């Protein structure tokens, strides 16, 4: 599934054009998986766009940031109001919102000493994820133990084994991996 673009992205407190939302290749998160995110579904209703459990998603966003000792320089209320404004600016009905925070550009090394935490909000139009029946196969890769990371946090680095599992089952003609 390709990405449907929008007009604007919110980055570190500013609305920027989609094509200008970029990071440096030495961004810490690209090398070490030091990013956190959420996925919030948006639904077109008669009263406008409804955001599914936005408050709870932003609460978990801060929980996940704390797990990686990230300092989010924006208040919860500011992120929520920025999501709502971004939805309007991008004219999203049915869609998807991706709050993202990551250790940015600063040094090359696992420990993110003196590296800023960058925050972005992305809102794109998005309908149903699946539009047909799925073929699912159990993967030989297993889910990470809850004791191998911070339980309940959405840490991007935790998803590497899910990528491996998807490659494995797709090569065998299946749509999704069960872990």
Predicted regions and their residues:
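Short, glycine/charge-rich beta-strand/loop segments that flank catalytic centers
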Residues: 75-84, 94-108
